[in-house]
Amino acid sequence: MVVRRILIVEDERLIALDLQRRLTQLGYTVVGVVASGAQAITAAFQLQPDLVLMDIRLQGEMDGIEAAIQILVDRFIPIVYLTAYVDDATRQRAQATSPWGFLRKPFHVRDLQAILNRYSGELLAD
């Protein structure tokens, strides 16, 4: 299986749109762009992405880690966390979801591509 379908969970609209544009230019299909943890859970179940790019600090009652935990209850979908800042306690909470990676904002598209390539390569090797 190769990563083709990506769900973006990002509450900063400009970052979400930039990510969507860059991923599309790289040949990926962005199946959805949502801004909250609750929307992420619904979209993950309905859209069945190959991977979720999840902001850790989301507006609202649920952060990205809590949303990832809920998504992973139903089925395994790889998560790559996006964050501008993460403390040790937050990183430990995130690690419990076995993420495929962390991207610190601002990040270069090559860093995102490296994670996506690694993920695809590991799946192809299985």
What are these regions (language model features)?
Residues M1-R5, R110-D126:
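Non-catalytic signal-transmission and effector/linker regions of two-component phosphorelay proteins
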Residues E12-G32:
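Two-component/phosphorelay signaling modules centered on CheY-like receiver
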Residues Q20, V33-L51:
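Acidic, metal-coordinating helix/loop segments flanking the phosphotransfer/catalytic sites
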Residues S36, M62-E66:
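Acidic catalytic/metal-coordinating carboxylates
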Residues D55-I56, T83:
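Active-site residues of response regulator receiver
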Residues I65-I77:
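Short amphipathic alpha-helix used as the core "switch/output" element in two-component signaling
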Residues V73, V80, V86-R104, A114, ...:
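Alpha4 helix (beta4-alpha4-beta5 surface) of REC/receiver domains from two-component response regulators
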